[in-house]
Each structure stands twice: as C-alpha cells, then as structure tokens.
Design a protein with these regions (language model features):
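Fungal secretory targeting signals
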Residues: 1-23
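A generic structural micro-environment signature
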Residues: 7, 16, 35-38, 55, ...
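Conserved beta-strand elements of beta-rich interaction domains across eukaryotes
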Residues: 11, 52-54, 109
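Short, surface-exposed binding/anchoring microloops in extracellular/periplasmic proteins
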Residues: 19-74
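Acidic, low-complexity intrinsically disordered segments
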Residues: 72-150
C-alpha cells in the first residue's frame, strides 16, 4: 500500500510539472547558388546562413570532378564550424526525378544541436544542354529562403 501511495504521489507530481516547449529558430539562407561547370569539370554551391542571435556564416563547396549533375555533399563545415550542412538529390521514382534537399545543423554551446532542411523539386535544378560543350546544371530557384530549425 505504501508503494501505491508513493507511486501515485510521483505521478501526480510529474503531471503537475510544466512541460517545456522546445525552442525553435529559423535559419535565414541568402545568396544560395548551385551549378556545375559548362566545361563539365566541376561544381559549386555557395550560400550564407544566419540564425538570429546565434550565428552568421558562409558555406561553400567546390570541386573539379563533377560532371553535369550536382554531387551529393556529405556533412561539410561552414566558415563557422558550429554549422555544418549536407546536400543531395533523392533517388528518382518512376516518372519523376528525385527532390533536392539541403540540411543545416547548428551545434549549440550546450552540446545539443538544432537542425532543419529545405527541399526543392528537380525542376529548380534544370539540366541545360549545350551543343558542342558539356551540359550543366544551374539552380534556377529563389536565392533567399528560410529553414525551420528544431
């Protein structure tokens, strides 16, 4: 009987405790650009990230090996290494090309992290065909957008 009373008081105490809502932030992405080289020898992705009152940094990637399609980029640090990002195109399904996705991860001083992502349809990354030279992919969507972080 003592155990039931103890268990009941613990449950009531836990139920009376306020539940903290997880704080969310918004990462403002600006100047986003992504393309492959018309010469068929490289790719570049570049953008700025600002999470108000937390961090502001520049993120970029370049290579000299990509062909006409943008590469998958695994977790890559920005200039401020508390922010890392990754970029990929999802696998295609029958009748459609896969969506593109960027993931932003910010390591907080507490040791926790917040993350969010943004998706685009494949039509925002058209493959431009060029006669006599290599094809290239050039991002054609909005250069500024927001990512909800949690």
């Amino acid at each position: 009987m003592k155990y039931i009373a103890l268990f009941a008081s613990l449950c009531l105490g836990a139920a009376a405790s306020p539940v903290r809502e997880r704080q969310t932030a918004q990462a403002n992405i600006s100047g986003f650009s992504a393309s492959t080289s018309g010469a068929g020898n490289g790719a570049s992705i570049s953008f700025d990230v600002e999470i108000p009152d937390r961090v502001s940094t520049h993120c970029s990637y370049t290579d000299e090996t990509s062909g006409s399609t943008l590469p998958t980029i695994n977790q890559t640090p920005c200039d401020d290494e508390s922010v890392i990002w990754q970029f990929k195109q999802d696998p295609s399904s029958p009748g459609s090309e896969g969506q593109y996705r960027i993931v932003i991860i910010h390591a907080l001083e507490s040791g926790a992290a917040e993350a969010g992502f943004h998706e685009w349809s494949a039509s925002d990354f058209p493959l431009e065909e060029h006669t006599g030279s290599s094809d290239e992919t050039v991002y054609a969507g909005a250069s500024d957008f927001a990512v909800d972080m949690s």
